[in-house]
Amino acid sequence: MSAVDYSLQIDEARETAICEVRGLSKSYRNFWLNDVSFKLEPGYIMGFVGRNGAGKSTTIKSMLRLVKPDCGEVKMFGMNYAENEEECKKHLGIVLGEFDYYADKKLKTVTGVVRRFYPEWDEAAYRRCISRFELDETKRVKELSAGMKVKYALALALSHNARLLILDEPTSGLDPVSRDELLDIFREFVADGKRSILFSTHITSDLDKCADYIMYIKDGCILMNGDREEIIGGYRLVCGGKADMTPELEAALIGVKETAFGFTGLIAERDLNAADGLQTAPADIESIMLYTEKYELHQEA
């Protein structure tokens, strides 16, 4: 009879959310991450969007306990992350900013160190990534461009059978061709329906291309969280002349950009009756962010 392994194991039959966050908060002197909650199911990509300083990195670092949150609970693979951090990390692929570890070491040396930490290291997968990303293992880390450092970090993350990738601004610094290639890899990664990705970005076109869900953070608070198509479908851009700006319409607009001839504003689909007779157009994530942030009409006092 074979020995029974009593170590903590992932029960895929019982697991529903691959990642679940409840009430995550973290306060600093001039910033407060306030009650962040969300759930990510297997097989999906969640894009985490917000302007610089909105709280994306603080959320991710608090989730991973790189900074200690004030309160909140994080579950990954059905396990409490704080209580089972080592076990959870075996199934995580993490890329946080530019890869600057072991700057004077060659890539093959760094890889030799990293692979020892992962029992499920997949050398064949690593070789495929190295080839696909056109990485030269004889180069030193400090010799790589910012984009190539991101590719190398992703090659490591994709090579140990991770079930969840958590990526902070992974496409920043990549040229358009490399960025599009990376988004293709994201879609391939979740195609089996068992793996998921949470990635933060300020490049809204990335979300249009590959995100199933959008989580939008502003000033430390989650403003929107849901299916990408449903979020986009919930808003319209409305255009009109100066005489068309009625008190009812002004009250309904989320944000407005005035021009010499009139205005363009963002309005919720449910409030479209206030824009009756005016020209409207579909919104996208970029316009929703722009009119919510830059052209915000109803700002808090």
Sequence positions of predicted segments:
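Catalytic Walker B motif of ABC-type/P-loop ATPase nucleotide-binding domains
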Residues: 165-169
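Conserved ABC transporter NBD signature motif
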Residues: 72-80, 87-88
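Walker A (P-loop) phosphate-binding loop of ABC-type ATPase nucleotide-binding domains
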Residues: 50-55
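Helix-to-loop junction immediately C-terminal to a conserved catalytic motif
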Residues: 64
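Short loop immediately C-terminal to the Walker-B catalytic DE motif
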Residues: 171-172, 204
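ABC-family P-loop ATPase nucleotide-binding domains
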Residues: 86, 90, 96-152
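Conserved beta-strand
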Residues: 21-24, 31-41, 72
